[in-house]
């Protein structure tokens, strides 16, 4: 069997035999969710995570003939201080792995050339107000982090939607 399901209370987890199967399974579930949301709304907003753990999922998702022109794509997190063309930038990862491949209605990167981190945060909060997130495609890190929300800075009642954080390994990010 390639996929095993386990359930604990309301949580359903699917364990896949390979990363390829996992990516395809997640993409199918994502495509179904996207189609359902687009039955309810004219346009939707999707927040994408950037990490090698997303490779198989992003590749499989592109195979679906979805109305991408009704979807606004948003970028979850970014390092501070990298050049615009730096391969380590998560925006560049997303551009390479999905954003450039599909005709999204719009793409919103968490980066403004020459802007201060604080101005980038303010701008992206405005983007999120205009495009409130309908669905997020992400993973959960080994230490429990989601994006750059490491456990020591993840405050669910935080008044800021976007902020600069200092990671446990001392690198600044937004």
Where does each model-flagged region fall?
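N-terminal glycine-/serine-/threonine-rich phosphate-binding loop
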Residues: 1-46, 118
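Ligand-binding beta-strand-loop-alpha-helix segment within the catalytic cores
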Residues: 2-10, 68-137
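Generic structural signal for well-ordered alpha-helical scaffold segments
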Residues: 27-35, 58, 62, 95-99, ...
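Glycine-rich N-terminal segment of FAD-binding domains in flavoprotein oxidoreductases
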Residues: 35-64
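Short glycine-rich anion-binding loops that position phosphate/pyrophosphate groups of nucleotides
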Residues: 52-53, 79, 140-145, 151
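Short, surface-exposed, charged loop/turn segments at secondary-structure junctions
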Residues: 143-165
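Conserved small/polar residues in nucleotide/adenosyl-binding loops
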Residues: 173
């Amino acid at each position: 069997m390639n996929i095993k399901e386990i359930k604990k209370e309301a949580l359903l987890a699917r364990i896949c035999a390979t990363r390829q199967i996992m990516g395809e399974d997640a993409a199918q579930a994502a495509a179904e969710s996207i189609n359902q949301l687009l039955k309810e709304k004219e346009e939707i907003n999707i927040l994408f995570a950037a990490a090698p753990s997303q490779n198989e999922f992003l590749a499989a998702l592109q195979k679906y003939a979805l109305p991408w022109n009704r979807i606004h794509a948003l970028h979850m997190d970014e390092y501070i201080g990298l050049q615009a063309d730096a391969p380590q930038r998560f925006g560049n990862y997303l551009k390479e792995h999905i954003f450039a491949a599909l005709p999204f209605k719009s793409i919103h990167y968490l980066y403004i050339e020459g802007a201060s981190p604080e101005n980038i945060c303010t701008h992206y909060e405005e983007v999120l107000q205009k495009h409130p997130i309908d669905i997020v495609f992400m993973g959960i890190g080994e230490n429990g982090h989601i994006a750059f929300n490491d456990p020591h800075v993840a405050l669910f009642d935080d008044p800021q939607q976007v902020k600069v954080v200092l990671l446990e390994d001392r690198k600044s990010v937004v």
